[in-house]
Design a protein with these regions (language model features):
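Conserved phosphate-binding/catalytic region of the ribokinase-like
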Residues: 2-14, 173-176, 202-301
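Conserved N-terminal subdomain of the carbohydrate kinase-like
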Residues: 10-17, 24-33, 48-150, 301
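Active-site metal-binding loops of divalent metal-dependent hydrolases
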Residues: 22-23, 258
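Short, solvent-exposed loop/turn segments at secondary-structure boundaries
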Residues: 29-35, 162-164, 199-202, 291
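Alpha-helix C-terminal capping segments
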Residues: 43-52, 265-269
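Well-ordered beta-strand positions
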Residues: 55, 186-187, 218
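Conserved beta-alpha-beta core of the PfkB/ribokinase-like small-molecule kinase fold
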Residues: 122-206, 226-227
Length: 301
């Protein structure tokens, strides 16, 4: 069970974190491209937190992917499932709204023998497009002994249309076998946008929605620069945490993945979900504040 405070001597201990998810290539309207994926952003945050990281990922041989793998290998031990092509996200702006399309298809199939040799203190499940199906989740669950499991839900909450466009997927509509595996997690992290919400300020409704489908884990729903909502099984109502000020003028790509990684690390140290979320929020804020052009601004009360 998760503790309410760090065990003696563990606050400075290097936590062994296993991150699982596919790499991506992001292509933008101006023709540029960059490596991406929750596994990359989460590993960067874990490295900043001085965790010892192992990554299980899938990717092809494109130049952007090789760049990402070089970076990952500088921060973590990498177990690679080679695929014909890396998943590609195409970004588009239409009528002032951003649209995302997906090219390719990946299903991660971690090797049981490799998994059984791993002894992570915590696992972060971080798919980008459903590559962790019930088979993969069950394999990981049965093969890896670990104290804490955390899932970043984004990759399960994307539904691909016939033309490749990605639309929000309803959590309750996921396969029951996937939901059953996710209910075994200690915590789940998701943004309100991935849940299909457009509220600017944190609201308890989204966390209640997640808890209806996943009543077991602690729930953290992030609201970008505005704050987050925290829900735990033993509390009837979620707790809304609003920021008093925000970091503006810099992109927040990867911030949610970094938040999830630090939450996972802190839970593995024995922190409560409340303390883990505070640490993660502060870590993301420090990271954003160091970016060129970052400006602190008060938020409306």
């Amino acid at each position: 069970m998760l503790g309410s405070k760090p065990a003696s001597g563990r606050s400075r201990e290097r936590i062994e974190l296993l991150v699982v998810g596919a790499l991506t290539i992001d292509r933008f309207p101006d023709g540029s491209a960059a490596p991406g994926g929750s596994v990359l952003h989460a590993t960067r945050a874990a490295a900043r937190a001085r965790a010892s990281v192992t990554v299980i990922t899938a990717a092809g041989g494109e130049p952007e992917t090789q760049e990402a793998l070089r970076e990952l290998r500088s921060m973590a031990t990498v177990v690679l499932e080679e695929t014909a092509h890396t998943l590609v996200f195409e970004h588009d702006e239409r009528g002032g709204r951003r649209e995302l399309s997906l090219l390719g298809n990946v299903r991660l199939r971690p090797d049981v023998r490799q998994l059984q040799r791993m002894r992570p203190r915590v696992i972060l499940l971080a798919p980008v497009a459903g590559e962790l199906d019930a088979v993969a989740l069950r394999t990981i669950d049965e093969a890896v002994e670990t104290r804490v499991r955390v899932a970043a839900l984004q990759g399960w909450l994307r539904r691909r249309e016939a033309d490749g466009r990605l639309m929000p997927n309803v959590l309750a509509d996921l396969p029951q076998a996937v939901l059953a595996e996710l209910r075994n997690c200690d915590a789940v992290v998701v943004s309100h946008e991935d849940l299909g919400g457009d509220d600017a300020a944190p609201d308890a409704t989204a966390a209640l929605e997640v808890r209806r489908s996943l009543p077991g884990p602690g729930v953290l729903v992030t609201y970008g620069r505005a704050g987050y909502v925290r829900g735990v099984p033993e509390a009837r109502q979620p707790t809304v945490v609003r920021r008093r000020e925000t970091i503006d003028g810099v992109p927040t790509v990867g911030a949610g993945d970094g938040f999830a990684a630090v939450v996972a690390i802190q839970l593995a140290k024995g922190s409560s979900l409340s303390a883990a979320a505070r640490s993660a929020d502060a870590a993301v804020e420090r990271w954003l504040a160091r970016q060129p052009g970052a400006v602190r601004k008060p938020l409306p009360s």
